[in-house]
UniProtKB/Swiss-Prot annotation:
It is found in: Secreted. It comes from the Eukaryota. The active site is at 187 (charge relay system), 234 (charge relay system), 339 (charge relay system). The keyword Glycoprotein applies. This is Serine protease persephone. Belongs to the peptidase S1 family. CLIP subfamily. Pfam families: Trypsin. It comes from Drosophila melanogaster. Its EC number is 3.4.21.-. Serine protease that plays a key role in innate immunity in response to Gram-positive bacterial and fungal proteases. Acts as a component of the Toll pathway upstream of protease spz processing enzyme SPE and Tl ligand spz. Nec regulates the cascade by inhibiting psh.
Length: 394
């Protein structure tokens, strides 16, 4: 059956397995490893048990299997008993609103020089990491994020963009990249009927956030000057009315500034509040994430060339300012509702270091054989820095 471009044109949301099937898995027997029996538990029940295994080096976060997606979040295969007496535990260390087109900037400049100093995005990232280190010290914070749900503080840059029509509606996501600026997709904010009102930060449950969340009014919207409604230059910046108050759950993220793609074994994730099932369109109230793999642009071009109608929106093909990513199992993807959210390059899961490599833009269907399209952040550093850090002030 042919795929419809209406799915591509909508905003994106995270897709995962059916929650109906997975909701009955709590308490079911499972295997953590071939030699370690387990039982399916919620993340809140599993985390205290798994903590000792991770600190002892017996398991890593990525070793914890998923039993499926329950009604309220991911269900994990958890060891049946706590790990390790004190004699077996080894130490673990850690390493340190108005909508307008922005002024025209020059073309892609990935690695310009700024005298003897760093470009603003790099300097800002160093400050973000310094503040994170000061806040967390050398304490290792364990979060169960190997599956779909995301615990508070794991992705403190995540922003939900609120629209007020006949009530509050969160249609797109974004990433906090500085104390007063959120990065998102241009198609989320490019019409009068699609004007965002505020951003919600620090919330995992988007409809029932805890006391630590912050809602901040959007002062202005800056759309890339070369965005004309197709799949190119799909990037925008929201300026907030005030600076955020940084907490453990609210903090800017680093931008990916390297023009080259990371090694093939790198870990990539998309995150957002989204639909659990493409048929019912029922949305998750909690922040979800899913692991993806980058697809080389030549392969991505072949995939899109096979889709009818793609030439209309991708007249130049899949070019260097885009990224392509896919879940090879065709289970997880971004789809309607998560546009503007991040494609995250995870550097170190233990100390929570990552960069925003892409902005969720579009795709051909959801969790299909055609990869999703993402705006490559490193192609737009001049645009971002000119708004967020004018005159190279960080």
């Amino acid at each position: 059956m042919p795929l419809k471009w209406s799915l591509l044109l909508g905003t994106f949301v995270l897709i995962s397995c059916s929650s109906v099937e997975a909701a009955v898995t709590v308490g079911r027997a499972c295997k953590v490893t071939d030699t370690m029996p387990g039982i399916c538990r919620t993340s809140s029940d599993c985390e205290p048990l798994i903590d000792g295994y991770i600190k002892s080096g017996v398991l890593t976060l990525n070793d914890v299997p998923s039993c499926g997606l329950g009604a309220w979040g991911e269900i994990f295969c958890c060891p049946t008993k706590p790990c390790c007496d004190n004699s077996t535990i080894t130490s673990v260390s850690t390493s340190s609103t108005t909508s307008t087109k922005a002024p025209m900037t020059s073309g892609r400049v990935d690695v310009p020089t700024f005298g003897s100093g760093d470009r603003p995005a790099v300097a800002a990232c160093k400050k973000i990491r310094e503040r994170k280190q000061q806040r967390s010290g050398n304490q290792l914070v364990i979060h169960i994020v190997g599956g779909y749900p995301v615990d508070p503080g794991v992705y403190p840059h995540m922003a939900a963009i609120g629209y007020i029509t006949f009530g509050t509606d969160f249609r797109c996501g974004g990433s906090l990249i500085a104390s007063r600026f959120v990065l998102t997709a241009a198609h989320c904010v490019n019409t009068d009927a699609n004007t965002p009102a505020f951003v919600r930060l620090g919330a995992v449950n988007i409809e029932n956030p805890d006391h630590s969340y912050q809602d901040i009014v959007i002062r202005s919207v800056k759309i890339h000057p070369q965005y004309v409604g197709n799949k190119y230059n799909d990037i925008a910046i929201l300026e907030l009315e005030r600076d955020v108050v940084e907490t453990d759950n609210i903090r800017p993220a680093c931008l990916h500034t390297d023009a080259t793609d990371p090694p093939s074994n790198s870990k990539f994730f998309v995150a957002g509040w989204g639909v659990l099932n493409v048929t019912t369109r029922a949305r998750s109230k909690i922040l979800l994430r899913a692991g993806l793999e980058l697809v080389p642009l030549d392969q991505c071009n072949i995939s899109y060339a096979e889709q009818p109608g793609s030439i209309r929106l991708l007249k130049q093909g899949v070019i260097d300012s885009l990224l392509c990513a896919i879940d090879q199992k065709l289970i997880a993807d971004a789809c309607k509702g998560d546009s503007g959210g991040p494609l995250i390059h995870e550097l170190n899961v233990e100390d929570g270091m990552y960069t925003i490599m892409g902005v969720i833009s579009s795709g051909f269907g959801c969790a299909t054989v055609t990869p999703g399209l993402y705006t490559r952040v490193s192609s737009y550093l001049d645009f971002i820095e000119g708004i967020v850090w004018p005159d190279n002030r960080v």
